[in-house]
Each structure stands twice: as structure tokens, then as C-alpha cells.
Amino acid sequence: MVKIGVCGPVGSGKTALIEALTRHMSKDYDMAVITNDIYTKEDAEFMCKNSVMPRDRIIGVETGGCPHTAIREDASMNLEAVEEMHGRFPNLELLLIESGGDNLSATFNPELADFTIFVIDVAEGDKIPRKGGPGITRSDLLVINKIDLAPYVGADLKVMERDSKKMRGEKPFIFTNIRSKEGLDDVIAWIKRNALLED
């Protein structure tokens, strides 16, 4: 089972990305989802209502505190959810774990996630990639979402591309508009090639 952690600031599109990935990949792969929220299970409920996945393949973890701690320093609640999901589905191939909304320093405990996708959105401004932080610099894949909003918020995608290359070196990043599915095929191709080790 490959575990992919998806993190990023509140409203960046983490849940939308996971919903789109399950919609496009669950026909071919044995998948499940774990979501994290501080005081609710709102993202899990959204997934249950909108995803093609059955309810028993989605677990919502209510962290009750700092979202970063629940995926990094004390990942015990999430590790228990991983164990529970693996018990339900022993042949699970791909588990997507969504962090609660966090800042640019969010990273996953290596025991919890084999790969990390960090999601930011253009509406936060084109300066976000150059601000760095472990989410930007260390994630296995950076997804720059909501590119359709660039002209409305004065964000320059060329600046974001330049700064992402500078901050990430050889690590990949993908521009997306998850709502319209633009860039989604590239994210899926990255998962298949890097996490699932397909050609």
C-alpha cells in the first residue's frame, strides 16, 4: 500500500484534488481516503457525498488541535486510521491522507506518508512559492491550483513558475485548475510514475 499525504493551506483545493483523484483512479486501483479536520469531519462528509467511493473507504479524523501535529509530531490518530483502513481492505493499493488546512511548514511524518503532495493556490498571490517553507521545498510534488484566478488576483504564473523552480530545484510542480480538471492528468501521471512505479 502506497500512502500519499496531501497538505496545504485552508481553501487551496486539497479536498477537491482528492475527490478528483478518487473519481478518476478508483476504477483502476484499490483506494481509500483519510481526512483530517480540527473540530469537524466536514471534509470526510464532503467526500462521502461527492466521491465515487463507498463510505467505508473514507475515514475522518477529528484532530482537536494543531493540524500540523496530527500529521507530523504525534501522528498516532492518523496511524490508527491507516491501520483500521488496511484492516478493512487488506489489498489496498493507494491511500490518500489529507491534512487539515495548515501553513507552508506542513510536512508528513515519514511513517504516515510515503509521498507528499503540497497544494497552494494562486489566490494567495504569486509570492507564495518564493516564501519557501518545507511544504514548498520538500514536498515530492507541488500543485499550484486555481490558475484560472490569476488574472483576477494579479498573480503572474511566470513568476510562480520561476520561483517554484528556484525553491524546488529538480522537484516537480504542476499548475492546475482542479475544478475544470486542467492539470489533473499530469498529477495522476506523476502518481502512477512515482508512487505506483508504473511506466
Swiss-Prot record:
Q: Could you confirm whether the keyword Chaperone appears in this record?
A: yes
Per the UniProt entry, the disulfide pairs are none
The record's subcellular locations are: Cytoplasm
One GO biological-process annotation of the entry reads: urea catabolic process
Keyword check for DNA repair: no
Q: Which InterPro entries match?
A: CobW/HypB/UreG_nucleotide-bd, P-loop_NTPase, UreG
Q: Please list the residues that bind GTP.
A: 8-15
Kindly report the protein's main subcellular placement as a broad class: cytoplasm
UniProt keywords, alphabetically: Chaperone, Cytoplasm, GTP-binding, Nickel insertion, Nucleotide-binding
Q: Which residues cross the membrane?
A: none
Q: Which NCBIfam families match?
A: ureG (TIGR00101)
Q: How does it assemble?
A: Homodimer. UreH, UreF and UreG form a complex that acts as a GTP-hydrolysis-dependent molecular chaperone, activating the urease apoprotein by helping to assemble the nickel containing metallocenter of UreC. The UreE protein probably delivers the nickel.
What does the UniProt function comment say about this protein?
Answer: Facilitates the functional incorporation of the urease nickel metallocenter. This process requires GTP hydrolysis, probably effectuated by UreG.
Name listed for the protein in its UniProt record: Urease accessory protein UreG
Source organism per entry reads: Helicobacter acinonychis (strain Sheeba)
